[in-house]
Regions:
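Short, well-structured alpha-helical interface segments that form or flank functional binding sites
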Residues: 13, 73, 135, 173, ...
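Substrate-recognition/cap regions that form aromatic- and gly/pro-loop-enriched pockets
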Residues: 312-313, 319-344
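Loop-rich catalytic cores of soluble enzymes, especially ATP-dependent carboxylate-amine ligases
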Residues: 109-127, 134, 143-310, 322
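Terminal catalytic/cofactor-binding subdomain
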Residues: 1-125, 132-138, 166-176, 180-183
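Histidine-centered divalent-metal-coordination microenvironment in nucleic-acid enzymes
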Residues: 17, 132-145, 318-325
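Short conserved micro-motifs at the rims of enzyme active sites and ligand-binding pockets
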Residues: 29-31, 68, 101-102, 152-153, ...
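Beta-strand elements of well-folded, non-transmembrane domains
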Residues: 20-22, 60, 144-148, 325-327
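Short alpha-helix boundary/capping segments
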Residues: 66, 162-166, 170, 333-341
Length: 344
């Protein structure tokens, strides 16, 4: 099969986060709407850190048009099932916040899996604060078709590497290229140059300037979300925890090491308080997903698969690019031009 035909079979998926907000522009305090289904089981609409932070998930589809059609359909469904006085916030940086305690942590019910997901998020709040977790973004997922890999391997492979190893090696090469040139994404598509003053309430030292009575900004900024006030692991620089992208084995080993290494600061938080779990553990990373990065190799998960175990056993299924801001000027926060640029 010609390469051009193989590329048309590649799959694209979009995950988009967004806050539910009340009529006065503040973060919604209501439970996850029943009309949106179970946040634990609905594959298309779930929640992220907060009960108010929705996450929309498309299927892996061929081409930008199909993905945008499905993302639009999910948006329309949400609009019809939100409480009457609520809206879906169209930007990455959050709406009016009234302190850490005013950001409700997502509730997934009383099952073991549901409780684990809630405790993990409580741990994020205790470690980094809830305000940072209220930031929303778009994740672009991309996978090459098996036909592409077969054709590509026939052309360039000069070793006896098995097909899984071949795919893993080249997916990791792709992630390294994204890390090397990924600055271009927020430069071209950054859409979070301003932030509500309420977001900065806990930041006593910052270099943002006043835009108006309610807004701060940074001259020439494109993406505050990807900057110092956005997503970060405060322990990374201090503890030297950086994912190693040299190979899939190195990547898995580096994250597992962080998941097994206790952190003194997190030990001070403790595991339980008044009988309630405060975090899953006191290690630098509670789970692999706690490591924030602009790009991650991801496995195809089934059931209750653990990500690192699935990566090790099954290999890389797709690449997740996490540095896209939500564009508030676009109907669903992203358009065909952006998707095709990322695919190229």
């Amino acid at each position: 099969m010609p390469f051009k035909a193989c590329l048309k079979a590649n799959l694209i998926g979009i995950e988009k986060e967004g806050l539910r907000v009340s009529g006065d522009g503040s973060i919604a305090q209501t439970p996850h709407p029943e009309g949106l289904g179970s946040a634990l089981k609905n594959p298309a609409i779930t929640t992220d850190f907060s009960e108010a932070l929705l996450e929309l998930v498309t299927q892996p589809l061929k081409g930008a048009d199909q993905v945008l059609d499905e993302l639009t359909t999910i948006h329309n469904y949400i609009y019809h099932h939100l409480p009457e006085n609520e809206r879906f916030w169209p930007a990455s940086m959050p709406c009016i916040l009234r302190g850490q305690t005013n950001i409700p942590i997502a509730n997934y019910g009383s099952s073991n899996l549901g409780m684990m997901k809630t405790v993990y998020r409580r741990g994020l709040s205790n470690r980094y604060g809830s305000v940072m977790q209220a930031i929303a973004g778009i994740h672009f997922n991309y996978s090459f078709s098996l036909e592409f890999w077969q054709s590509y391997r026939e052309v360039i492979s000069k070793t006896d590497t098995d097909s899984k190893g071949f795919m893993d090696d080249h997916y990791m090469g792709l992630t390294r290229n994204v890390l090397r040139y990924g600055w271009l994404i927020p430069y071209l598509f950054g859409a979070s140059a301003t932030v509500c003053k309420s977001f900065m309430h806990d930041y006593h030292d910052h270099n943002l300037e006043e835009f108006d009575d309610n807004t701060l900004y940074l001259p020439y900024a494109t993406s505050l979300r990807m900057g110092d006030i956005g997503y970060q692991n405060s322990q990374e620089d201090e503890k030297g925890v950086k994912a190693n992208y040299n190979s899939l084995c190195h990547y898995i080993f580096s994250l597992r090491a962080a998941m097994k290494t206790s952190c003194e600061d997190f030990e001070k938080i403790g595991l339980k308080k008044n009988g309630e779990y405060q975090q899953l553990n006191t290690n630098i990373l509670q789970i692999a997903n706690e490591y924030y990065s602009s790009v991650r190799p991801k496995p195809i998960l089934y059931g209750n698969d653990r990500p690192l175990r699935a990566l090790n056993n099954k290999g890389i299924g797709y690449i997740e690019i996490r540095s896209l801001d939500i564009n508030p000027m676009l109907e669903v926060g992203i358009d065909k031009e952006q998707i095709e640029f990322l695919e190229a």
